[in-house]
């Protein structure tokens, strides 16, 4: 039920991102996107390594939802459109979409391999054989990917929109 908080705040993050970039940053999306990326990494860290208290889990899902809402709006389309001429905006969105699905697929494969290679069979207290998954490596992989996701857009910080 706690994870259900995420999409509610994701909607708020999406709506808020447009207002924030247009009114506060005059259409410059790099600073709010960077901030949302850092917030997403912090929220993921809290969720994975924050101790598991009820408050920490709820806080991590609130922050994660807001951050993902902003990032999906910006990185999923708006920043790509900002970097290319208007005539190429459809192609830019298509490339971002394909790259997103390819990266998500690769993430699923790597996550599966990390979990498969860090799984042990154990006998529980009542004598049943159970499978135990060690999420240590996969958690660090997810956190590393989150950090990369806010560092990569910095490569285009000085780039201006191309005009046609």
Name each model feature, range by range.
Residues 1-9, 91-95, 134-137:
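Loop-to-transmembrane helix entry
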Residues 7-15, 101-105:
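Residue-level signature of mid-helix packing/kink "hotspots" within the transmembrane helices
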Residues 22-37:
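Cytoplasmic membrane-interface "Motif A"-like loop-to-helix N-cap segments
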Residues 28-31, 113-146:
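A membrane-interface helix-boundary motif in multi-pass transporters
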Residues 38-52:
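C-terminal ends and interior cores of transmembrane alpha-helices
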Residues 47-49, 135-164:
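Multi-pass alpha-helical transporter architecture, strongest
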Residues 70-85:
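Intracellular juxtamembrane helix-capping segments at the cytosolic ends
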Residues 86-120:
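A late C-terminal transmembrane helix in Major Facilitator Superfamily
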């Amino acid at each position: 039920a706690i994870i259900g908080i995420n999409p509610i705040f994701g909607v708020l993050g999406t709506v808020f991102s447009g207002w924030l970039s247009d009114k506060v940053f005059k259409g410059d999306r790099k600073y709010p996107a960077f901030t949302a990326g850092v917030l997403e990494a912090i929220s993921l860290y809290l969720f994975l390594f924050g101790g598991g208290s009820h408050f920490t889990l709820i806080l991590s899902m609130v922050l994660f939802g807001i951050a993902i809402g902003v990032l999906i709006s910006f990185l999923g389309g708006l920043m790509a459109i900002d970097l290319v001429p208007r005539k190429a905006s459809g192609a830019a969105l298509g490339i971002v979409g394909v790259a997103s699905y390819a990266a998500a697929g690769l993430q699923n494969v790597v996550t599966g391999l990390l979990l498969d290679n860090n799984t042990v069979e154990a006998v529980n207290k009542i004598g049943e054989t159970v499978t135990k998954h060690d999420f240590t490596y996969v958690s660090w992989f997810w956190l590393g990917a989150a950090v990369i996701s806010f560092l990569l857009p910095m490569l285009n910080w000085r780039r201006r929109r191309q005009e046609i």
